[in-house]
Amino acid sequence: MDTHSLLTPTAPRRRLRAGLPLLAVLCALAGTGVAQAQAPAAAPPAASKDDSAIVLVGKDGWLFPAWGSLSEVDMQAVDASTRLIAETKARLAARGVRLELLLLPDKVLFYEDRLPAGKVVSASVEKRYDTILGSLQKAGVDALDARKVLAGVRAGGTDVFYRSDQHWTQAAADATADALAARIKQTVPNLAGEPGTGTPLGKETRERRYGDLAELFLPPEQRAAVGRETFTVRRAAESQGLLDSGKAPVHVTGHSMVQAYFGFPQKLSNALDRPVTVNWKAGNVGPWIMLLEYLESDDFRTNPPQVLVWQMFEPVYGFGPQAQGQWDNASIMTPAQFTARVNKALGQ
């Protein structure tokens, strides 16, 4: 398991593993490495003029991953995922760990006007984020409205996603981290640890490169037409280093959006003024196995956090642990198996 304290941002890694489904390939350029940005699993075809099955080429060089439905919302699947999350929250609470479900919104919601001609977001998908939040609230899971946070950033004239990449900008990650830190301080006012132990924020640098969607899925001529863009990266402060142990009152588990390259865990630690640890993993593993890998780890057994942030992604929220063809074979399990492993990891 890739469990770290605040990972030092490094340049994107471009190594692809042959034979992986589309899901694994989609995020191969994600910051410090590949993580599970979710997408339907399928063998990626060779780049061609018609790449619409993989990436939507929109207006002004805007690219969108094509694995989220623009027209339909499977409410049965949404509610099934919510039930598992609510059950997990209750079991964690019994162990003294508060669950913070962090649902990140779809890129397309903020840039519908940049979609290709003829592509529109249906009314149900436009409301999908709020629909999921409603499902969670009905089940007793109160979650941060990250869409509202990002909408505020966007209203201020700052982009919240990169033009040719599937990932969020540092401004979006920072705003979300600040909002989540405020929630945590309110709900858990007595965080363990000492003041002054949060991560100091380093200087911002800028990198010119192709976004992952352009790099991986566009033929050379089209990639050149889309062009490189500037990524803002906050380098590690000189005083920042890895923790000697896994002791931290807050842990984050999720996919590539929460890796250090995009700045979220560092900003969360800085805002909380406490250490934060994070685990994420390369490939199409999905959020369910990532949570289990942390709960089943020595880090959790010896140093359970007070708050566990479990990050999910709106377009694939309904993909449960049993989602054949979405996660790799080693990650597939029935909901009952997922629950049994959670119970065992928590000693219940």
Region spans (language model):
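Bacterial N-terminal signal peptides that target proteins for export
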Residues: 3-23
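Bacterial N-terminal signal peptides
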Residues: 21-31
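Extracellular glycan-modifying ectodomains
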Residues: 2-7, 36-348
